[in-house]
Each structure stands twice: as C-alpha cells, then as structure tokens.
C-alpha cells in the first residue's frame, strides 16, 4: 500500500493548444514564488510531476519545457512515436502504447481482411505524421507473400484550404477499387474530414479508425452514406463503477464550483430533481483508467523515493533531488486501473494491447468484435449484424482474385532500340505469376 497523502493534484485544462499548455506549465513553476511571497511554504516547494497531456503535439511542447527543470511528464493518451526519443524527451513517460504498436495492429487487420489496396489520410500534425510514418514502415517490413499498396497518402488540416481537400478527394476517386481508408486523425480533424467528405459526395468506404476518434459517434454524425463500415482500434476500456458512483454523487451535490456538473446539466437538461437522468447517459471517457495509472505511477515513485510506509515517510520532499524522481518512475511496477501490469521500458512506454471495435449503423453504437496483442489478432465477427453482398466488409484490391487452380497472366511490352538501324521495335513478353 502506498501513502495516500503523498500527492496534491492541481488540475489545469489546456485542450489541444500547445501555447496554452506551455503557459500552464510555466504557472506551475511560478506557483512556488507566489507561495513564498504569501509566506505559506518553504523555498523547497516544487512541482513533482505533470500528468498529461492528451494530444501528442501539446505533450511534446510541455515535455520539452518541463524537461529543462527535470520534471517528469506522464501522458495518458499521447501516442506519437517521436515521444520515445530519449535524447529529446528524457523525462517523458506514458501509460498507453505508442504509434509503433498501433501500426502493427492496423497492418494485422489489413492482412486479415485481405485489404491490399488502401488509402491513408492523416492529420497534418505530430499525431498524424508520426502515425503514418510508423504505419508505412510497418507495412513495408511486414513479412507476407502479398504486399499492401498505399495508393493515396495525404496529410490534411482543418485549417487548410478548400482546394487542398478537393484535390485529395479527386485523387481518392481515381482509385475506385481502393475501398478502405485509414484515417489517422485527431478527433477534431476527423470531424472536419467527414463534413468535407459529405460535401464531396464520397460514398461507401470502409474506414479504419485510430485510437484518437474510434468510439465517438459524433465524428460521423449525419455522414452514414459516406461509410459502409467503420472498424477501429483503441486501448481496452475498463469498467470503473467506483468512479461512476463518485461522478453521480458529485452531480447530485450540485456544487456550483464544479464545472463538470454544470456542463452535464446543460447538455442533459438535468436538475436536482431529475439528476438521475444523467446516470444512464453520462459515462466516463475510456482513458480514465490510464489517467489514474499515470497518477499512481507518480505516487508509487514518490512512495519509494521518500522511503514511505502507509502512514509516514522517512525522507522529506525538500531534502531529495528532484532529478532522481524520473528514475523512480522508470522503476515502478504495479497492477494499474487499466488492469495491465504497469512498468516502463527504456523509451518510457508501457506494453500495450488493443481492442477492435465496429460501428453498428442500426444502433449507432460501437461494438467490441476482437482484440489484438503482439502475439495474435482475435476477431469475433458474429457480433456484426449487417447483411449485404459485401458482408462483413467489401474487398479492397487492385484486381479480382483468381479462381482456384488459375493464375494471373501479365502482358507487358518492351521497347528495344537498335543501335545499328536506329529503329525502335516492340516485343511482347508474357509472364505467369501465381497469386
């Protein structure tokens, strides 16, 4: 058991804005000067660690700054593989797997469904660029007889021009046999993409959703004609009944200082008398368990660093070197709220696995249909109830597969220049290649 009095948590919200998060980080370091001015603490008051952020770009900016002060950053959702670079982010850790692992999972799905002719679109930011790079490297290195061909590979931004989106959609339409789109986008960019795709009259594609937007029906609201199916990957969602009970209790208290209660009342039209309506509608984000894992990683590290038992600590925070905390975080090992064994590798990342989800059009809900780990992909497609000629998913190949016992005949022409006569002669050659 760890000493539960170790942590004082100061919460700040900076959304996806890197500049705002840098300002918040600076405020954390300036708090010490404010407390000193008020005369309520010693000069040894210091920020121990920062939990967050969610967006990879924001986390990179924050970790770059706080690393100068030897303050660890533990993210619960940032997956960019760039954050694994210890020469840049020496004090960074995360409780979710990196894009490298997600790329392996996506590639496994492509081969499982024999999708060998695909389109890759990504946010033009750290999350998208990093993810696509990892995916293309994984596809290239994947050992298989049939290679995956990426026919469209484009970055987009919701702050970009309309011309760029039009160009991308026209390029997609040049490959009618490519029916699978891997959308490696952060949530706001995914919302933007589907709105633009609807205006461009994109129809009946299969989308592979990455962990940033899978699970959200808001992304595809009003865009059901664009996709035939959506299948996606995300770290496992863990049931948190104690957290749900605490959240509901907080709503019932109707604390005017609680911004979350206020927002819930606005969105669900709740009041003191009808707050029970929130019980069935409000649910915690799937990353809550990973946030708690990040917080407890710091707690376990401080517990060991300060030589604590359940009641007291042998050492004082003011007497230890803050630079040592990172190494204690590196060495933690415990069973987390995510039901995973939490420990960090040399890149500051935990091991990971993914659940596979499918968006059921009839119910507008995501259904878990499988799981992926580094050892195996397991699918249960019987849970998908969507009849049709392409059940469960359409083909996405450059040509039709041959019948059993036949092979593809490739015919190509070779131009040969005769140096003596100066004439160009055409020779037809044939090559047989089995599928």
Report the location of each language-model feature.
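Extracellular ectodomain signature
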Residues: 1, 18, 23, 31-57, ...
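Acidic helix-start/capping segments at beta-turn-to-alpha-helix junctions
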Residues: 6-18, 316
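Aromatic (phenylalanine/tyrosine) cluster motif
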Residues: 8, 13, 29, 410-412
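Short beta-strand-centered segments that line the small-molecule binding cleft or hinge
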Residues: 59-78
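Flexible loop/hinge segments that line or gate small-molecule binding clefts
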Residues: 77-91
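Short, conserved non-catalytic motifs in the polymerase core
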Residues: 90-96, 276
